[in-house]
Amino acid sequence: MSGLALEFCNVSKFFRDKTEQEIAILRNTNLQIHTGEIIALIGASGVGKTTTLQIAGLLNKQDSGKVKICGKEASHLDTTLRRKEIGFIYQFHHLLSELNVLKNVMLPLLISGTPKTIAEKRAKELLEFLKLEKVAYQPVDTLSGGQKQRVAVARAVIKKPALIIADEPTGNLDPNTAKDVFDLVCSFAKENGSAVFLATHDPSFLQKASRVLEIVNHSLISSI
C-alpha cells in the first residue's frame, strides 16, 4: 500500500441540542493520513472524537465536504468500501457471543466473499501468532478481557485493511494488557502498511504515534 489512506476535504459536521440549536463538531476540517502512519486523536470528553472516527470509518456521514478512503471519494456511507478497506477496534470488543473465537476472526473475510477454507486458514494463522490457538474453538465469553481484545484486533486486521479505526481500544484493560494490545495493533499496521487512526486518553500511546492531533474549536490541530 502507498499514498493516502484517509483524507478529509473541508469536512463539517453538526448536531442539534435539546433546544434545536445547531452545534458544530467539525467545521471545514482538512486531514490527510498516509498509509503506515499512526495518528493519535486527543481532546476533552464530548468534543467529538468518536464522531470524527465514525466519519473516517464511513459509519456517520459528514454534513458537508468530502471523505476519501485510499483516494476514493465516499459520497455516502459506502458499505463495500468500508468492508474492503477499513478495520475497527473498540473499547468494548463487540465480539459475537454466539460464535466461537475462530469464527469471530473469520467473519470479515466471509462477509467480503473469501472462500471459507481460505478464511479459516488465515484466521488460524493469526490466532497462532497471537498465542490464542488453544482457545480457537471456545466461546468468546470464556476468555479474559485481554484475550477478547486480542481477538478483536485479529478480526480488525485479518483483511489487511488500509485504515484501522481504533476508538479507545484499550480503555477497559489494565496497563500491561493495554500496552500488549496496542503493540499488537502497531505491529500489524507496520507489517501490512496500514494507517491507524486512534482516539486515546493514554499518554503512553502518544509516544508511538507518528502525529498527535487534537480537536480544538471544531478543527483538528497538531499537538505535542
Curated annotation (Swiss-Prot):
Keywords: ATP-binding, Cell inner membrane, Cell membrane, Membrane, Nucleotide-binding, Translocase, Transport. It holds the Pfam family ABC_tran. InterPro entries: AAA+_ATPase, ABC_transporter-like_ATP-bd, ABC_transporter-like_CS, ABC_transpr_LolD-like, MacB-like_ATP-bd, P-loop_NTPase. It is a peripheral membrane protein. It comes from the Bacteria. Its main location: membrane. Its EC number is 7.6.2.-. GO terms for molecular function: ATP binding; ATP hydrolysis activity; transmembrane transporter activity. ATP binds at G43, A44, S45, G46, V47, G48, K49, T50. SMART domains: AAA. Residues 6-224 form the ABC transporter domain. GO terms for cellular component: plasma membrane. Gene3D superfamilies: P-loop containing nucleotide triphosphate hydrolases. It is found in: Cell inner membrane. The complex is composed of two ATP-binding proteins (LolD) and two transmembrane proteins (LolC and LolE). Part of the ABC transporter complex LolCDE involved in the translocation of mature outer membrane-directed lipoproteins, from the inner membrane to the periplasmic chaperone, LolA. Responsible for the formation of the LolA-lipoprotein complex in an ATP-dependent manner. Belongs to the ABC transporter superfamily. Lipoprotein translocase (TC 3.A.1.125) family. This is Lipoprotein-releasing system ATP-binding protein LolD.
